[in-house]
Structures are given as C-alpha cells and as structure tokens.
Amino acid sequence: MNVKSARTIRVAVVGAGPAGQAHAFGFRNAGMADALAGIEVVLDTVVDPDTALAETVARRYGFARTAADVSEILDNPEIEVVSVALPSFLSVPVLGSLLRAGKHVLGEKPLGRSGAEAAELVEIADRTESVAAVGFSYRRLPAVAQLRDAVRDGSIGTPYFARAHFLSDYALDPSSPMAWRFDREASGGGTILDMATHTIDALEYVLGDVGEVLACTLDTTITRRPGEDGQTHEVTNDDTALISLRFAGGALASILSSRVGAGCPIELGLEVFGSTGHVRYAFNRPNEWILYQKDLGEPGTDAPRTIIPGPSARYFTDTMPMAARGNATGYGEAFVAQMQELLRAVVAGEPMDTSFKAAARTMRVVDAALASASERRPVVVARA
C-alpha cells in the first residue's frame, strides 16, 4: 500500500517508562518507510505524571511538549494517534477514554487483565472509526516474519508440534520490592500475562488460532517481597508458567515462561517441527533463523541452514538505514516497524493485524490457561 497524498499526523505517547520510550523511538523513525512518503509525523506530547522523566524522554526523542495527565491531550483535536504504555490496571480506562475522544490508539500487551476487560475495549473500539491495536512487537522482526512465511508456504510440510519460551531474570532477586507486577489484582497475572502473551502471539502468528489449552501449571517461586512500608507482602501471581496447547489446525505446542530464569535477562525462542522439516528462532540472535528441509541433500549433508534476512524480508528495508543483507536488525527496528504499521493503518482506514480483536483472542487463550491451571483439566478457548 503506497500513500500518495501529503498529510500531517500528530502523535503522543502516554507513559514515559521503558516501553513508552520504545514507542517514542518507533515514532521518531517511522518516516523511513517508503509507503509513508508524504506523511509528516509530528512528535507532539509525552504524557507521564513524573514530569522530570517526561521532559527527559521528550527531549531525547524530539517531542515538542509534555503533560502530566492524559486529560491534557483528550480534547486536543490536532493529536490523532496515541500510544499507551502503562501498567495493566491503568491501561484499560486510558485506552477507553482515548477511543471515546476519537483518537487512534496502540496499547501495550496484554490488552487488559482478562478476556472480559479485553472484550470491553473491543466493544468501545467497535463504536468508533479509530484504529485500535496492540503492540506485539516480536512479530515485526524480519527474521520472525520470514520464518512465519516459510511455515505458511509449506516449507516444512504439515506442522506437527512447536515449542516456545520466554525467560527473564528481572524478578529473581527476592529483595526486589513489591510492585504491581507481583499483584494479581493489579496485573491480572504474572509471567503468563507479562511474557507468555508474547509467545502465544508469536505461535498464533505462525500456526494460526489456538483451539484448546490442554494443561497449564503456574508456580510462584518467591512468595513474599518487601514493601515500602517496611513489611513483606504476598506475591499473588505466577513467576513461572508451563502451558500445553493444541492449535485449531491440529499442531501441539508447549510454552515455558518465567521471570526467575537465572542468567537470562531476556531470552525468547520459537521452534516449529513439521512433516518435512523445522524452523527455529532465538531472539538473542535476532537477525537470523534456522530452516531444515529433509528433502534437501542426502543423510549427512541435509543439515539445517542459517537464513540471514535481507531487503526481500518484510520490515527490513523500511527500518534499516543501511538496508543490505547481513546488516543486523534488532528490537529497536521492531518498534519502528510497529509504528509504521500503525500509521499505515490510520492513513488507509484499515485495522492492523494486531487489532484489539486479535489481542482479545490472546486474552481468551490466557483465560483458558488460567482456568486449566485452576481446574486441572483441558479448556477449550472461548470464541468471541
């Protein structure tokens, strides 16, 4: 899709933490896409109650002003597009108010704290003409997009099974203070919402819809954490999640997600095995993926091949200042591609592939996993 007519799109970012800064970086570089030629992206406002942080982020990424509260941008008709990077318990009312004000929005995953909250936001979005999307950024990596195309094109035959993991050690230290991420009411869930939602989306991106959660086990390793009041507080959500899935197309999959993975600051991996081959991806080597096809070569010479994406890969040319094969793309470029997709959707008046409806489906998979863990039985994923 090429954008022909000149247009100015004024954007704002709500939340100046790490995710909000990634959004700001994405907006700042979104104009690199050839398909957005003629579009001027105006970096308007960074919103955060921590005004010093907001000013630092605005200065760093080139935004014109700051605001302490989202109410300061709601009635500004010049601001068309707003990205939101807030804790789960804050994001739902903010996204709802922005949609009601006629803004196009992109929120961070997860979409709310439950399938019910996600459905509420879908209903609000359906009453508007706004683009309403969620930032599942890993699917914007060229290597992941190429891997997905290979599976969908039959390069490994019929998919039989897959496994994915997302490991981090940000919660490994038991002296780390109690925060909203460790509270079930505020977060909706622990690593299952914070991290496993990324792997669920990646697997569905490659294999299609999850049909059933076969089993789920949740575990809290560090059960209490110190609070600002000098007392220790109970951790009420999961540090580790193990999930077994069956896809509507028949493939099986397993997910391991943990925030107490010692020595793994961030490690995401994806593997799909089919009737004639397999694919593998590891985020710590973001600019490559592995393809094995058993019909290429004789036994002993039919080893897996390392594929290095280049300009033919989706998102590569639009995000790379030196778009030559072998130059590495990484997580920063994924956020650039994400914001480019958002702006394309706004200009075209079309939904993104990671729309609220798509993100609500991810939340229904999470709901099924939570029910499976609680009831110790398989749970079919609910339909919308």
What residues fall within each predicted segment?
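Short active-site oxyanion
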Residues: 41-45, 80-82, 189-190
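Hydrophobic residues in well-ordered beta-strands that form the structural core
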Residues: 107, 132-134, 163, 255, ...
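Beta-strand-loop-alpha-helix segment that lines the small-molecule cofactor/substrate pocket
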Residues: 81, 87-139, 154
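N-terminal Rossmann-like dinucleotide-binding module
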Residues: 1-61
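Predominantly a Rossmann-like dinucleotide-binding segment in NAD(P)-dependent oxidoreductases
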Residues: 19, 138-235, 376
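Conserved SAM-binding strand-loop segment of SAM-dependent methyltransferases
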Residues: 64-70
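C-terminal glycine/acidic-rich active-site capping loop/insertion
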Residues: 137, 225-234, 242, 246-247, ...
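C-terminal helix-rich "cap/oligomerization" subdomain common to oxidoreductases
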Residues: 1-5, 35, 81, 296-297, ...
